[in-house]
């Protein structure tokens, strides 16, 4: 089949790679314009653009899909399907109606739970036991299309947003390829409408959410730390400096909220209930360090405090 692929970040790379390596033809890639990045703020191509260039696939990088010239270019492809993965631009109904067999999205949650911008992080924060990927029809409403395929991934106490992201991207690639193969064979895909009574929304992360409140339970703080790794990274003050906390686990024990109880095996800090064992942390201008290495250069003692 002739497929147009719309995606931008790392999450969208495995599915594009799978389609490139398949019998399908990716005739055009849509991705967001290059953005300034790094200290020099040089324009940087999206990961999807880099992969498309590597394989010589034609690219479009419009600021909007409402532009008539852009729509004419997409229509000229006479594509069988449009595949979407974390593209980041609204796709107008006129574009959705162009492909012969429709438009299909890779969404990183088990819909209808966690529609929206940050499904991976919200699943972790909420303490969900599993997450997954839904292959769905694209409709004008946000993540509201009928569901075609779903794949699940358990959430463990060691998972971060990054580990889940990577696992879900691979599952999404596998499921989307299955869907496109079936679409080519049968000319249609069976789809199940979402149960609107079960819908929850995954609001975009706000940097203010990354501040650690030591009055919360250790389980909740562990999920916060892991959900905000690699962005925006949970943090607290330590001796007047902002300390970023990259990895932490909840353990049993008691101490005043924010007070260091022990530094013998990780840095154990009191919470509203239980202790948070900080395993990896970072001071301004420094590297991410395991707790043992951090303590070698930044001695801490029981009774020292995190937070104001």
Curated annotation (Swiss-Prot):
<protein>
    <recommendedName>
        <fullName>Methionyl-tRNA formyltransferase</fullName>
        <ecNumber>2.1.2.9</ecNumber>
    </recommendedName>
</protein>
<dbReference type="InterPro" id="IPR036477">
    <property type="entry name" value="Formyl_transf_N_sf"/>
</dbReference>
<feature type="binding site">
    <location>
        <begin position="109"/>
        <end position="112"/>
    </location>
    <ligand>
        <name>(6S)-5,6,7,8-tetrahydrofolate</name>
    </ligand>
</feature>
<dbReference type="GO" id="GO:0004479">
    <property type="term" value="F:methionyl-tRNA formyltransferase activity"/>
</dbReference>
<keyword id="KW-0648">Protein biosynthesis</keyword>
<dbReference type="Pfam" id="PF02911">
    <property type="entry name" value="Formyl_trans_C"/>
</dbReference>
<dbReference type="InterPro" id="IPR005793">
    <property type="entry name" value="Formyl_trans_C"/>
</dbReference>
<dbReference type="InterPro" id="IPR041711">
    <property type="entry name" value="Met-tRNA-FMT_N"/>
</dbReference>
<dbReference type="InterPro" id="IPR037022">
    <property type="entry name" value="Formyl_trans_C_sf"/>
</dbReference>
<dbReference type="InterPro" id="IPR005794">
    <property type="entry name" value="Fmt"/>
</dbReference>
<dbReference type="Pfam" id="PF00551">
    <property type="entry name" value="Formyl_trans_N"/>
</dbReference>
<comment type="function">
    <text>Attaches a formyl group to the free amino group of methionyl-tRNA(fMet). The formyl group appears to play a dual role in the initiator identity of N-formylmethionyl-tRNA by promoting its recognition by IF2 and preventing the misappropriation of this tRNA by the elongation apparatus.</text>
</comment>
<keyword id="KW-0808">Transferase</keyword>
<dbReference type="InterPro" id="IPR044135">
    <property type="entry name" value="Met-tRNA-FMT_C"/>
</dbReference>
<dbReference type="GO" id="GO:0005829">
    <property type="term" value="C:cytosol"/>
</dbReference>
<comment type="similarity">
    <text>Belongs to the Fmt family.</text>
</comment>
<dbReference type="InterPro" id="IPR011034">
    <property type="entry name" value="Formyl_transferase-like_C_sf"/>
</dbReference>
<dbReference type="InterPro" id="IPR002376">
    <property type="entry name" value="Formyl_transf_N"/>
</dbReference>
């Amino acid at each position: 089949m002739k497929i147009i692929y719309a995606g931008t970040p790392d999450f969208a790379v495995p599915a594009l790679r799978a389609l490139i390596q398949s019998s399908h033809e990716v005739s055009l890639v849509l991705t967001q314009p290059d953005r300034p990045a790094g200290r020099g703020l040089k324009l940087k191509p999206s990961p999807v653009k880099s992969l498309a260039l590597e394989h010589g696939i034609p690219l479009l990088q419009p600021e909007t899909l409402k532009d008539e010239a852009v729509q004419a270019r997409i229509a000229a492809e006479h594509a069988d399907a449009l595949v979407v993965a974390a593209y980041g631009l609204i796709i107008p109904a006129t574009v959705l109606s162009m492909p012969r067999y429709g438009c299909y999205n890779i969404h990183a949650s088990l819909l209808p739970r966690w529609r929206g911008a940050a499904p991976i992080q919200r699943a972790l924060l909420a303490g969900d036991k599993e997450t997954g990927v839904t292959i769905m029809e694209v409709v004008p409403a946000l993540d509201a299309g009928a569901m075609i395929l779903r794949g699940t991934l358990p959430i463990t106490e060691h998972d971060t947003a990054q580990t889940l992201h990577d696992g879900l991207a691979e599952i999404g690639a596998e499921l989307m390829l299955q869907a496109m193969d079936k679409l080519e064979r049968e000319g249609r895909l069976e789809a199940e409408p979402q149960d609107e009574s079960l819908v929850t929304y995954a609001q975009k992360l706000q940097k203010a959410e990354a501040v650690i409140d030591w009055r919360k339970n250790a389980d909740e703080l562990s999920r916060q730390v892991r959900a905000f790794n690699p962005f925006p990274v949970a943090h607290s003050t330590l001796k007047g400096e902002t300390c970023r906390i990259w990895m932490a686990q909840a353990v049993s024990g008691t101490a005043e909220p924010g007070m260091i109880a022990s530094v013998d095996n990780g840095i154990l800090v009191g919470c509203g209930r239980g202790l948070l064992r900080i395993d990896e942390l970072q001071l301004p201008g420094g590297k991410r360090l395991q707790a043992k290495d951090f303590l070698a250069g930044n001695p801490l003692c029981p009774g020292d405090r995190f937070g104001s």
